[in-house]
């Protein structure tokens, strides 16, 4: 018979056994890379010893996780994927499965047989359903472009290494007056080995109010949790108003007026100091001209007088000489 058909038939029989047992499986949750407790919940009302019992756990594919045969662990029947990953607590009748992987999720059975000389008798069965979770990292916002004209910004929000697949990823924009949620198309990728998810969204977020500062959050929603990113703050630059010349004129005009007044004052003082000197010089020149004219007049008047006197002297000297010599012309 085809091995795949055989495995499929085994799984069907195992599920049917769960259904026919009449007991709902105990739901267990554990986290990736941690430890899950698979209880057997055996009351042992007859106080039977482990040396009389055969206890083992198997998964939904009938692969044996652990077997305690008459009080001793038996590894011959343990599947390789569980080898070295289990430990049995005889006090609580619990099997611990370590280093959990996503693929460990599913149905498990704890089965106990009582070994008698006549054969094995099943005395207990416990069904468990294991869910394996992995917490996503805190969402992170990364801008992929600068703010464009205070109108919008392109950004990416991402979260990694989580399981199961999240329900929703969005961006929340808060301003002073409003709160807006932007939904994006979630991009998913799953690791082939760990089966963990990485998710992200890329959005162009427009600003509803360009006059106020804003805060952006990234939100990741799973079945159990709601993760919030650290706040991403945006401080918009205030639009520059047109240049106002009135304050400039108001500041400069008094200075100009003061400078003009000082200049006029200096000029007035300079003229005031210069004016007496000019009048003095003018008076001096006038006096000098008058004295010169008077001198000239005097010279005109005085020169003939001196000529008459000279003529008289000359005549007198001539007469006297004529008298002495008695010869005159």
Curated annotation (Swiss-Prot):
Tree of life domain: Eukaryota
Topology, Cytoplasmic side: 269-329
Segments of skewed composition (Basic and acidic residues): 287-312
SUPFAM superfamilies membership: Immunoglobulin
One Pfam family this sequence matches: V-set
Protein's cellular compartments: Cell membrane
Annotated function: Receptor involved in the costimulatory signal essential for T-lymphocyte proliferation and interleukin-2 production, by binding CD28 or CTLA-4. May play a critical role in the early events of T-cell activation and costimulation of naive T-cells, such as deciding between immunity and anergy that is made by T-cells within 24 hours after activation. Also involved in the regulation of B cells function, plays a role in regulating the level of IgG(1) produced. Upon CD40 engagement, activates NF-kappa-B signaling pathway via phospholipase C and protein kinase C activation.
Name this protein carries in UniProt: T-lymphocyte activation antigen CD86
Native organism: Homo sapiens
Gene that encodes the chain: CD86
């Amino acid at each position: 018979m085809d091995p795949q058909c055989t495995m499929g038939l085994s799984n069907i029989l195992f599920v049917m056994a769960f259904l026919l047992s009449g007991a709902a499986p105990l739901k267990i949750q554990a986290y990736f890379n941690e430890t899950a407790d698979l209880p057997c919940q055996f009351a042992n009302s007859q106080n039977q010893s482990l040396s009389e019992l055969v206890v083992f756990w198997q998964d939904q594919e009938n692969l044996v996780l652990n077997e305690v045969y008459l009080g001793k662990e038996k590894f011959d029947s343990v599947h390789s994927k569980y080898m070295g990953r289990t430990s049995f607590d005889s006090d609580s009748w619990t099997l611990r499965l370590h280093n959990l992987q996503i693929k460990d999720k599913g149905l498990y059975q704890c089965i106990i047989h009582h070994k008698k000389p006549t054969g094995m008798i099943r005395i207990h069965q416990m069904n468990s359903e294991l869910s394996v979770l992995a917490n996503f990292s805190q969402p992170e916002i990364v801008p992929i472009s600068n703010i464009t004209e205070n109108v919008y910004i392109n950004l990416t929000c991402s979260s990694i290494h989580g399981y199961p697949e999240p329900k929703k990823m969005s961006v929340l924009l808060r301003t002073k007056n409003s709160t807006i949620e932007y939904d994006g198309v979630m991009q998913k990728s799953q690791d082939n080995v760990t089966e963990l998810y990485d998710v992200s969204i890329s959005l162009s977020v427009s600003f509803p109010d360009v006059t106020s500062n804003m805060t952006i959050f990234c939100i990741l929603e799973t079945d159990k949790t709601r993760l919030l990113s650290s706040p991403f703050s945006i401080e918009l630059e205030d639009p520059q108003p047109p240049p106002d010349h009135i304050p400039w004129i108001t500041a400069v005009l008094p200075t100009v007026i003061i400078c003009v007044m000082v200049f006029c004052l200096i000029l007035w003082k300079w003229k005031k100091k210069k004016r007496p000197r000019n009048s003095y010089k003018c008076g001096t020149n006038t006096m000098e001209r008058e004295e010169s004219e008077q001198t000239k007049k005097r010279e005109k008047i005085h020169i003939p007088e001196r000529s008459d006197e000279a003529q008289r002297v000359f005549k007198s000297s001539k007469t006297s000489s004529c008298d002495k010599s008695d010869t005159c012309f």
